[in-house]
Structures are given as structure tokens and as C-alpha cells.
Regions:
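Carbohydrate-binding surfaces of carbohydrate-active enzymes
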Residues: 61-62, 144-277
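Aromatic- and carboxylate-enriched substrate-binding clefts and catalytic-loop regions
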Residues: 1-169, 204-205, 220
Length: 277
């Protein structure tokens, strides 16, 4: 175990990373683990009074030197240029429903550059038995990711999905690419004002009771995203705040309203508010 509270150990680790950058042209690093739990059980460190979370902070500080980074565990690093993903998710519908509230919580804590783990679930054993893969879950997971700040595949979709479902995932990746400039602009803005990129409904409408909504979110200022999170569902209710909303399918909804919308497997419902903020 590396004691990063020791400046010599920190410098050694940094040197190892720098070597990979200089010798092999590595662009950046995915810093996995680093959890405080690894520094419990009476471990004695260089900085004698370090609490376990402090070691997580030292680990996170390593990434500040490398513009391309990703973390799962951080401590007191809000507002800094670190990409922060959610903890590993299992491939089940219960964990799928945790992605939106988890992303919102991270943003409100000051971690704007967030990633909802990996599409379909990030546990390393998730895709060892291909016969048990819930293809619908992978597709709906890709749809949740598509309009988040980051989108990350683990298993190759074409390896585990039917051609039709693989095509849906491809379209979601292309949708993410389509919104790339907008998401990047939001990231730049967040670096200046600290606002989350993924916002809860109550951010803009704080007195409407929207704080209980956990299955839809606002990207930026005016894009309402409402993915399907229920197995076998081909429609869902969407809560629209006041204003005129234009859907991905060209439909128009005038809010405030709650509307049941069609959401076949290939559709990620999203709606743009027609008033600029």
C-alpha cells in the first residue's frame, strides 16, 4: 500500500505516471479505487494524524497534473478539474434508477465533470456470462448516458447485443457526439461559475415540488431529459415545468403539465425549452 501522505511516495508515484506519459505518449489516467476504507484498521502513515479520507484526498490530487483523468473516489476536491464517476453499478434496473439522482448529487456537491459509471453496469464480472445479459437494460442505460457529461462503454455493444439493439446504442453515442459542443461549453462555464452541468428540476423551479423527481433532469439550462428506467416500459410520464417544450420527435408541450409520452425502445425522450435563460 502506498502512503501518499509521504512526499517521497507521492513524488515516486507521480514520476511513474510521468514516465508513461513521456515514454509511451499516454494521454491520461483512470484513477480507480483510492477509497478511505483501504486506510483503516490502525494503519500508521507518514502524516501521523491523517484520517482515512485524507489519503483519498492525496490520491485525488495526483490527477490534477493530468488534464485527462477520471476518479471514482475523491475527498474535498469539489470545483477542481477532476472527472468524477459514480461508484460501480451492477447490471440491474435498481442500479439504473440510481444514476440520475447520483449524478445530480455529485453536481450539487461541486463535482461538475461527472460520469454515470459504465453503460449496462460497471462491475467487472457483469458481462462474463453473455447468456444472462439483459439487452434492454444495456440499451436503456446507454440512453441515460447519452446526454450526460460523459458517456462510457465497458463491454463492446456489438459483442453482446443483437444487431438492432447495437444500432440503438450506436445512435445514442452519435447523439452524445451531436451534443458534444454544447456539453463542452457547459463544462467551460461550470469551471467559471461552479454550476452543475446536470441539474435537478428544482434548480430552476424551486417551489413546484420538483425536488422529489429522480427520473428526469435538466442538461444545462433548457434541455429536459427523461429516459425510461422501467423494464418493458414503452411509455412514461414526463413532468413539464412552465413554458413551451419541443421534443426530440417534434412534439410540443405547454407546461406546467404531466404528460404520458411514447417511448419505444429506440427512443430517448428529451425536450428543449423555447425560452433562453
Amino acid at each position: 500500500m502506498l502512503d501518499l501522505s509521504n512526499p517521497r511516495a507521492f513524488a515516486w508515484m507521480e514520476g511513474e505516471l510521468d514516465h508513461l506519459v513521456e515514454e509511451y505518449g499516454v494521454d491520461g489516467f483512470k484513477f480507480d479505487a483510492g477509497d478511505a476504507k483501504f486506510y483503516e484498521s490502525g494503519i500508521i502513515s507518514f502524516e501521523g494524524d491523517s484520517i482515512p479520507n485524507k489519503h483519498t484526498e492525496y490520491f485525488a490530487k495526483l490527477g490534477l497534473k493530468y488534464p485527462l483523468n477520471e476518479y471514482r473516489a475523491s475527498w474535498k476536491m469539489a470545483g477542481l478539474p477532476l472527472a468524477q464517476r459514480l461508484r460501480d453499478k451492477t447490471p440491474d434496473w435498481g442500479d439504473l434508477k440510481q444514476l440520475i439522482p447520483g449524478m445530480i448529487a455529485q453536481g450539487l456537491m461541486g463535482y461538475a465533470y461527472t460520469c454515470p459509471d459504465m453503460i449496462g453496469g460497471g462491475e467487472y464480472q457483469s458481462f462474463l456470462k453473455l447468456d444472462n445479459i439483459d439487452q434492454e437494460l444495456v440499451v436503456r442505460s446507454a440512453q441515460v448516458h447519452a446526454l450526460m457529461p460523459m458517456m462510457q462503454f465497458s463491454v463492446a455493444p456489438w459483442r453482446v447485443l443483437s444487431p438492432a439493439n447495437n444500432e440503438i446504442c450506436k445512435k445514442m453515442a452519435l447523439l452524445h457526439e451531436k451534443f458534444g459542443d454544447e456539453i463542452l461549453a457547459l463544462a467551460h462555464r461550470s469551471s467559471k461559475n461552479g454550476e452543475p452541468i446536470v441539474k435537478p428540476m428544482a434548480w430552476f423551479w424551486p417551489d413546484a415540488g420538483y425536488e422529489v423527481i429522480q427520473d428526469q433532469f435538466i442538461l444545462g439550462d433548457n434541455l429536459l431529459v427523461a429516459p425510461v428506467l422501467e423494464k418493458d416500459a414503452r411509455s412514461r410520464k414526463v413532468v413539464f415545468p412552465e413554458g413551451t417544450w419541443i421534443g426530440d420527435d417534434g412534439s410540443e408541450v405547454v407546461g406546467p403539465a404531466t404528460v404520458e409520452i411514447a417511448a419505444p425502445l429506440e427512443r430517448l425522450p428529451y425536450f428543449r425549452l423555447q425560452v433562453s435563460r
